[in-house]
Amino acid sequence: SVQALAGFVTENGGQVDILVNNAGGQFPQAAENYSANGWRSIIDLNLNGTWNVTQALGQQMLKGHGGVICNIIMTIGRGNPGIAHSGAARAGVAELTRSLSYEWGPKVRINCLGPGAIITPGMEATYDDDVLSDIGETPIPQPGTPEDVANGVVFLVSPAGRFITGETLMVDGGVSRYGSNQALKGSDFGYRTTP
């Protein structure tokens, strides 16, 4: 459990300087078809999971010398057809981040990073070829890489980001400002379907 991890760190004379919350997930489905259990599972994973880890390790940071937290969410603010449950949870994480930046500053800086279309094996397995071919239709006409996300995280948690807190850095090639969800229209929202 998270409390056991926090206790282990303290008991062994350690302290947490940097926390990156990067657990998350969703299952694509039309919102009207979510079961109560399906909804709760995504909220628990994306929002409550982030909160549980943040609270346990944030308490240590507040008692100690402080620290930095980066919450990985997703590109939010434009709607994401087929994953409304995940969008709601991650918007909750963004608001939690803004609130904690006031409560926990100046000892703890906390920000979010919102990746856009990052080409990974999971992305290729999830989206159909039409959506994947449209990924490059952004002001930066290419998909992102895991290294792009890592570079954003390093910036936010390093001294280079020392005057940034309560913000969400979008690493998405500009799609959150200028892109389109047109490719996601239709009954399957552009997700691969299994027969």
Regions found by a protein language model. Name each.
Residues C112-T138, D148, Y178-P195:
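A glycine/serine/threonine-rich, flexible loop-to-helix segment
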